[in-house]
Amino acid sequence: MISISVIAQKPQKLSSNQIYEKIQKLNFIGSALYIAAHPDDENTRLIAYLSNAIKARTGYLSLTRGDGGQNLIGPEIRELLGVIRTQELLAARNIDGGSQFFTRAND
């Protein structure tokens, strides 16, 4: 007897408000890509405005992950700092409604 288990990603359960917002975005044809060198260079206010008020498909391209920066509040440096800043950016995009993109450039 062979047993096979398949693990798949569960579909998101969206609230009625989230579904309504996604439908509203279908009525706008346009997109915006905000590009900056470091994770802390983004203008979250602009990204949120374009994504939520204008209903544009909005993204932020961070050329680096911020692993070359300074960390005044913790011991993380280099790659570990890049991991923290990456998670911060992903959390910010969940709040402001934009998409997050990265390049492979080193800081």
Regions found by a protein language model. Name each.
Residues Q9-D107:
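Active-site rim/loop-helix segments in enzyme catalytic domains that contact anionic ligands
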